[in-house]
């Protein structure tokens, strides 16, 4: 999974760093912090285009799902998914109790009353195939990204690793961006040129026209802040073994259980205090 839930600019801003010497180190720390958040929450907040398979059932409990491209079932277990569901065949439920019909991401599917099918291939192992967009995203929208800038030159090669843009005011290394249907991950920025990883998170590298819009992926503010907090603490911990609290300008953090449990204690200390409500039970 590509993506950091806080940009390099976010982390450097808290640390008060303006030099670029440690940019790669900070980016890698922010990436590691993001994966720690994923592991802690039992879910990922980056979005991934993928096809996933599930055992058949009357109701389907799913990993976080933002959009369904196709849903097919194999009713007779012959490994051919002969039934293609339409949106009126199922009902999507999100988190919560009172408002689960109106929340994202989707975590459960049930057969609608007027469906042509009685179940999702109930009783058939690997009886369900779902192609779609997976992940928590920003927890609000099925399209968790915002328009930011445009390309100033077409991208004509599938292997090109740079793209020229109109402005970089809101862009930073560590961000995941979307151009057309392709996700890219920003490694670095020089003037108005981005160096990127192409076709990340299940998307394919593609060509793009000049003036194509560029979008920046968004995450819940609590998740972004937790990533900043954890990245700052991990960065400081490199040279300050044993330090449990620090104040940097108006920013401060306090760690518990760090001496006893090392880095694991640091991670749990920060995440327990900030994003416990995002944890999902394993199923």
Annotated model-derived regions:
Residues 1-283:
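Divalent metal-cofactor coordination and adjacent catalytic microenvironments
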């Amino acid at each position: 999974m590509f993506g950091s839930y806080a940009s390099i600019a976010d982390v450097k801003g808290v640390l008060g760093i303006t030099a670029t010497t440690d940019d790669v180190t900070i980016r890698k720390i922010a990436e590691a912090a993001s994966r720690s958040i994923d592991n802690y929450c039992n879910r990922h907040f980056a979005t991934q285009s993928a096809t996933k398979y599930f055992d058949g059932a009357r109701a389907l409990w799913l990993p976080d799902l933002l959009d369904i491209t196709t849903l097919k079932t194999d009713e007779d277990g012959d490994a051919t998914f002969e039934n293609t569901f339409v949106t009126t065949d199922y009902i999507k439920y999100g988190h919560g109790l009172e408002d689960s019909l109106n929340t994202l991401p989707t975590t459960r599917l049930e057969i609608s009353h007027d469906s042509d099918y009685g179940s999702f291939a109930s009783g058939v192992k690997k009886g369900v195939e779902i192609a779609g967009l997976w992940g928590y995203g920003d927890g609000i929208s099925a399209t968790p990204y915002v328009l930011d800038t445009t390309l100033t030159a077409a991208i004509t090669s599938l292997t090109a690793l740079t793209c020229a843009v109109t402005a970089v005011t809101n862009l930073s290394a560590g961000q995941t961006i979307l151009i057309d249907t392709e996700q890219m991950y920003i490694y670095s920025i020089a003037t108005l040129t981005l160096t990127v990883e192409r076709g990340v998170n299940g998307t394919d590298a593609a060509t793009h026209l000049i003036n194509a819009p560029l979008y920046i992926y968004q995450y819940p503010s609590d998740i972004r802040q937790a990533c900043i907090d954890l990245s700052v603490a991990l960065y400081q911990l490199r040279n300050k073994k044993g330090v449990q609290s620090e104040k940097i300008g108006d920013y401060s953090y306090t760690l518990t259980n760090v001496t006893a449990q090392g880095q694991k204690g640091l991670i749990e200390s920060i995440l327990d205090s900030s994003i416990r409500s995002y944890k999902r039970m394993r199923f």
